[in-house]
Each structure stands twice: as C-alpha cells, then as structure tokens.
C-alpha cells in the first residue's frame, strides 16, 4: 500500500526508529539528572558542616559556629559514652605525662574529692561535628565497688568483735588483729563503730559507699 508516494511499511519503520531514538535520549537525560542530584546531595550538607566519608558516616567537619550541627563535645551526657577515670595509683609522673587522671579516689566532702577529665565518645547514630572522641572535664574521682554503709554498719555492730567489718572493707591486717583480740576486748569494736559513723573507716580501695535509692 502506498500513501502519498511512500510505502506504509517504510513510514512505520521510520516512526519506530524515531520513537526508539526518543526513548534513548530520554533515558540519557534521566541518568544525567540522577547523577547530578546525587552530587548535589553530597555538596548540600548543613551550612558550616561537611560530611565525612568512611566508617564515621555520622560525623561532620565543623566550620561554622552558626551551623545547626554542634560539636560532639557539646552533647549532653545521655548522648555520650565516657570511660572511667584513669587511676594512677598515686603516681604523679604518670599523671603529668598523661595530663589527666586520678592520683587518689574518694573523699567525704566535695573539697576532698579530686576532679579530672575523662575520654568520651559520641554514641553511634548521633550526628555531630567531629572529633567524635574528646575529653570531658570536671569528672569526680569516685568509684564504687559494692560496699554499702548500712550493711557494713550491721556487720560492725553484730560481728565487729570478730573483725568481719574490716574484712569486708579490705583491711585484712587489722581485721586479723581485731579477730585475735576479740575486738580489743570490746574497745576496738566500739571505736570502729564510731569511725564508721563519722566516715573515718572506709573501704581500703578508696571507693565510696554505694547509694541506695
């Protein structure tokens, strides 16, 4: 069949070729658009913060104080994980080399307790400006090792003549002496009760009493 001097089959073939060419051009434009959008998403991070690649994908490089992304060191305590204070066991040289840590633990009054910086890190999934690991200052040099004041006081009152209270607190040497003398014939037993109540007798490892809520 001839239409306007051209076979119909030839016209259909030309139409299919034009349609195929149009589809190819459309696919090419769509792929270029997706590539541009992906690049734009990497560039358009929050103002003043550049996203870091690699395992710390939730870290940002801090560059603008007006940015909505804050430094990891400004996060509240519930969003960070901190190590326990470093115990230098009275080694002043090690303390000076490291720059932080505790020479001694514990204390009855606030003024008696040392304060130091500890290593902290932002929790996984929390977005903040790097570095994600930082020092957080003014942490008290206090540790808890399972000693309860009420329990120790009861031990001292009922079994103090046998040195159970001092055994419990880790004062093994004096506990043996207290046991052999049956609490110093009652005098040592009474003195230890007073020392416990006034805070003069504490765990030997420098830990504080555990708090009961």
From Swiss-Prot:
It is found in: Membrane. Residues 146-194 form the TM2 domain. The keyword Signal applies. GO terms for cellular component: membrane. Its main location: membrane. Residues 1-22 form the signal peptide. Residues 23-143, 203-213 are extracellular. InterPro entries: TM2, TM2D1-3-like. It is a multi-pass membrane protein. The chain crosses the membrane at residues 144-164, 182-202. Glycans are attached at residues 37, 91. The keyword tRNA processing does not apply. This is TM2 domain-containing protein 2.
